[in-house]
Amino acid sequence: MAAVAAGGLVGKGRDISLAALQRHDPYINRIVDVASQVALYTFGHRANEWEKTDVEGTLFVYTRSASPKHGFTIMNRLSMENRTEPITKDLDFQLQDPFLLYRNARLSIYGIWFYDKEECQRIAELMKNLTQYEQLKAHQGTGAGISPVILNSGEGKEVDILRMLIKAKDEYTKCKTCSEPKKITSSSAIYDNPNLIKPIPVKPSENQQQRIPQPNQTLDPEPQHLSLTALFGKQDKATCQETVEPPQTLHQQQQQQQQQQEKLPIRQGVVRSLSYEEPRRHSPPIEKQLCPAIQKLMVRSADLHPLSELPENRPCENGSTHSAGEFFTGPVQPGSPHNIGTSRGVQNASRTQNLFEKLQSTPGAANKCDPSTPAPASSAALNRSRAPTSVTPVAPGKGLAQPPQAYFNGSLPPQTVGHQAHGREQSTLPRQTLPISGSQTGSSGVISPQELLKKLQIVQQEQQLHASNRPALAAKFPVLAQSSGTGKPLESWINKTPNTEQQTPLFQVISPQRIPATAAPSLLMSPMVFAQPTSVPPKERESGLLPVGGQEPPAAATSLLLPIQSPEPSVITSSPLTKLQLQEALLYLIQNDDNFLNIIYEAYLFSMTQAAMKKTM
């Protein structure tokens, strides 16, 4: 009875195992023999040693209803990957107790380790018999084992699929343990793999070499590098440290750079992307940020000399402006202390007020205030210091020309060392400057504000003809903000001027040559329109509370909106903008231009600063 019960349990176990095997291969119909515990080893040809795989479990030898008629499978206990091998005439078995070695048709050598030596010998004998049987059938050329593949097309397809799957699995496991580098054929493996180190070619390909001109064919110093800032015309502060060519070669340089960028905007970017190094970027021309009408004005007028450098593009030697056409080292008098604690709002306010005084300094502007205040004296010094060909300063007026003389003839004071560090981010003004005062319009090469206003009105009319697709106010207003200085350069100027006598001549001596290159038409609204107009009494000017020159913000705001009073009447009149055009232009500039928004914010800070000053009074 015990033997019958044991046989029943074994039979039930075989049935369960057969059902499990049929889930993987439905053509298995009978289990021939079983080995309870085996482990699979593979032989490494390079290391010439055996390596254990992750296949370990029960070995089943079975028969199939399709070809091949026999096979064995190791049901893996460690993972879901089982080892299946069909028994064909190509298998070669060798017994080395407790290992059963075999070599398959792909010449891969495996070793099966048996926990029970008796099972090892029994399974080895069974394998040899089945292999000899397959070899005998193949030698005879006829037999029932080959007929399903040849005669029955449906079973033949299933057998072929099974063989393909087994072969693919064997190749996968073989390649998985192999350490040889394999060729990458999938594009996703190349582009989506973060650990893949891509080689950097020393040269571009032949097609790129043919398409891209050599550096000696163009006058650009580095034509093979095209940065995004140069492509989209954005000013980069890193260009302040580059050396700029003289202004007389501006038109040739601009035409060559524009022709080169029209021909090769994308291919240069391809070559640029092959390098990990950041190339030295040269300053882009300012025409990239200007509207076409301003460019025409710069090209046509013989008296106006457009600058190849703005304050953002030329390296500032000592962070100061120029007087009488010469470079002097700083706006501070020798020995003047640094006022480090100047507030940020005062600096922003002075930067905004500095913008409006460029078009405001008319002959009558110097006589608005009391002569005893520093502002008119500084205006007088302004008119004397803006002669374009003068090398030595004119006779000092009320003692305000003495600091420039000290810097022409003296040395740099120790306080300007930190000033020079800030100055690298901002450029110095050009040697030749145009006067603002109307008394010097008769000199050669000098344009009065009236003539400049006429030219700007001509530009406005030309711009209105081409303004069908965009608002009339989109005349590159942010460039005007950039030319007035951004960020840090004015901070050092304010920090180093403790009193009004030193601040006033500094913020009024500004080169008017920035105006033809960057100014919008005369009807362009300034940011000061949005600020609350406040009148400042002369007492506040004398007490030194104003951060900039002593002229009221309302006068500065209206000077940009109204034509400058001139002795000769203005012939050309311009029509004002409609309310819709003004609304569209302001919305466009606020949404798309950060510099325009910064100017409005600076004007707001300026008004808040003045309100705070009045409260302190």
Curated annotation (Swiss-Prot):
UniProt entry tagged with the keyword Cytoplasm: yes
Organism: Homo sapiens (Human)
One GO-annotated biological process of the protein: deadenylation-dependent decapping of nuclear-transcribed mRNA
GO molecular function: 5'-(N(7)-methylguanosine 5'-triphospho)-[mRNA] hydrolase activity; enzyme activator activity; mRNA binding
Residues with N-acetylalanine modification: 2
Record keywords, A-Z: Acetylation, Cytoplasm, Hydrolase, Nonsense-mediated mRNA decay, Nucleus, Phosphoprotein
Bias-annotated ranges (Low complexity): 252-261, 371-381
Cell compartment(s), UniProt: Cytoplasm; Nucleus
Disulfide bonding pattern of the chain: none
Gene that this polypeptide is encoded by: DCP1B
EC number: 3.6.1.62
Keyword hit for Acyltransferase: no
Name of the molecule in the record: mRNA-decapping enzyme 1B
Residue positions where Phosphotyrosine is found in the record: 191
